[in-house]
Amino acid sequence: MTLFHHVVDRGAKKRGRNGEQRLFPLSSLLDGYECARRDEHISYGASAAAVPPFGCTFSSAHGQQNCLAVANEEGFVTIFNTGEKQSSVLKEWQAHDNAVFDIAWVPGTNCLVTASGDQTARLWDVITGDLLGTFKGHQCSLKSVAFYKQEKAVFSTGGRDGNIMIWDTRCSKKDGFYRQVKQISGAHMKPERFTPQTKKRRGMAPPVDSQQGVTVVLFCDETKLISSGAVDGIIKMWDLRRNYTAYHQNPLPLQAYPYPGSCTRKLGYSGLSLDYTGSRLFSNCTDDNIYMFNISGLKTTPVAVFSGHSNSSFYVKSTVSPDDQFLASGSSDHNVYIWKISDPKQAPMMLQGHSQEVTSVAWCPTDFTKIASCSDDNTVRIWRLNRKPEGENSTIQDGNLVGWTIRKVQSPNRTPGHHSPVELTPSKNPGSVRSVSLASPQPATCAPTGAALPLPSNTSSAPPAKLTSPKMPSSLQQWISRSSKSPVRKALTPVLQGLSFEHRVKRRLETGDSASSGLGEEIDGVSELYPNVKRSRSSVSTLKKEDSFGLESEKRLGSDGAEASGKENSSPRRTDWLSVISQKFKGSAQPKSPSSGSSQQDTRTLESPAAVSPRPMKVFSPPTNKKASPSKPMKKISSYFMKRTQD
């Protein structure tokens, strides 16, 4: 019996200071995993540049269980000897000209199979380095390769083309390559919501969709295969004794395990692993959860969920400890997580040290004290369990330690009645924001407040600004006047309190005249910069084509207003509107003639739509171009008829 089995069967014993022995559970040893600098290895490519490793796995051959095979992005395969205290490189060669995404040992032998992005799988002899065979048939990159633990000649591959292929090395080669003996096409294709209009042409290969890719294949026994897809969210079990090539539509699996999460869109799986009994399936989902299914029963819902890590890619894998008590998985937050399978809600242990996403993780099948991990920081690390007496520190010096273990601190659950304070985005720098003049001093209701804006995680919250209701000033002169300390601003049209504005959502406020006549005037910051365009629009909406006198007065008042605009930074309409109001108050104290009243009334109609009284107005006929002299009496209409009769 090995030391590992003795520890598992009898438990972990620690000797106290008084000499007595105490029995501890095996989970109490998890915090002893450490990675020394001598167990950190950099993965290199063809040009001696560091490249990320994609897959790692321990050998199952007798006497070779300490051999670790690692494949990287440049197609290189490296064999490490992890049996010694300092792991060393046994062999290294370039297996493919493209990336190797997965690797699998042939059970009980010194051979392994590599699945590459060059659409082929290759069988290698590790001792001699010879290529024993090439397997062709996929139309896209191969993402996964798997053997049954008691079968040496048959293995399976899954690719991005959505096909699952079964290979047998006992079959003869054709054109120098091995061909698949069984194929499951479209294993994880999403069902189409509509019928494709284009017809399939004879002799043309089917189009390849990246969303139908097969991410993982795994044997559960010699006749059943488990697979997962990228986006369909379904784990499927296939009976290899069936002929799936006869299906004209999507093939029907023996059993299907639908996505059990709460996400609205279906997600995919990046890794699948079985315990050593073959009854519990652990699936790494891209929703940051690991679901455990009991595949020996009839239920298709998970029996446990492991959470706490992060999974944002299809390279994160998981592995089960040789005693079936713990689950280890990579994570996108640069850590390796270890859960106790019998207690999924317990906080996991974190193996910290990597600086990028941890992808593949392998637990030595014959040594509980050894874990291998691959990361996007271009390193492969061997984590060893450093058993030390109680009360003593690690035997490895801090300078030589590149990885350590801590327990993840779970966030406390919120009480049902507790609500966190609303975080507000800090106010922006006024100098960096372009100033745009509004059509009214009142804020538009569609403008978002501070609570409605997104808050970055690295910014501090600011108190919300108090919104005060605008008040009408006592004097118009006081409203447009500003002090020396006040910022430069435009004199904008004040809104009458008696009018109701309901079209604020479009950031447009209507004046009284436009509201009554049905001709809305769009007032925004852009039109304020072009007073000539604004005057032309107002003249079109208020004047008639035959009113030549009104047009001349409009041009005259507009030119005067332009001069005032350059001095007081106000619009020409503002100066004309104020002058009309002043004339109104001046003229109210003295009697007015019909002609003067008509002129003032026309000026108000032309220049101040907002100041028009809601009561009906009298319409005056426009005066003629030649003014009648006051000494000459006006002719009667009857005199014209008399002349016409005399002629």
Swiss-Prot record:
Biased composition (Basic and acidic residues): 543-558
Binding partners and assembly: Component of the DCX(DTL) E3 ubiquitin ligase complex, at least composed of cul4 (cul4a or cul4b), ddb1, dtl/cdt2 and rbx1.
Presence of the UniProt keyword Mitochondrion in the record: no
SUPFAM superfamilies noted in UniProt: WD40 repeat-like (SSF50978)
Transmembrane segments: none
First-listed, main subcellular location of the protein, grouped into a coarse class: nucleus
One Gene Ontology cellular component annotation held by this UniProt entry: chromosome
Record field: compositional bias (Low complexity): 586-600
Gene3D superfamilies: YVTN repeat-like/Quinoprotein amine dehydrogenase (2.130.10.10)
Family designation: Belongs to the WD repeat cdt2 family.
Subcellular compartments: Nucleus; Cytoplasm, Cytoskeleton, Microtubule organizing center, Centrosome; Chromosome
Region annotation (Disordered) ranges: 410-487, 534-647
Intervals holding WD repeats: 48-88, 95-134, 137-177, 209-248, 264-303, 308-349, 353-393
GO molecular function annotations of the record: protein-macromolecule adaptor activity
Pfam families, per the entry: WD40
Phenotype upon gene inactivation: General developmental defects, including apoptosis in the central nervous system and a dorsally curved tail, which appear by 28 hpf. Effects are due to general cell cycle defects, including defects in the G2/M checkpoint.
Pathway(s): Protein modification; protein ubiquitination
Protein's recorded name: Denticleless protein homolog
Any single GO BP term: proteasome-mediated ubiquitin-dependent protein catabolic process
Function: Substrate-specific adapter of a DCX (DDB1-CUL4-X-box) E3 ubiquitin-protein ligase complex required for cell cycle control, DNA damage response and translesion DNA synthesis. The DCX(DTL) complex, also named CRL4(CDT2) complex, mediates the polyubiquitination and subsequent degradation of CDT1, CDKN1A/p21(CIP1), KMT5A and SDE2. CDT1 degradation in response to DNA damage is necessary to ensure proper cell cycle regulation of DNA replication. CDKN1A/p21(CIP1) degradation during S phase or following UV irradiation is essential to control replication licensing.
Keyword tags: Biological rhythms, Chromosome, Cytoplasm, Cytoskeleton, DNA damage, DNA replication, Nucleus, Repeat, Ubl conjugation pathway, WD repeat
Positions with biased composition (Polar residues): 426-443, 471-486
Motif, DDB1-binding motif: chain positions: 167-170, 238-241
Organism the protein comes from: Danio rerio
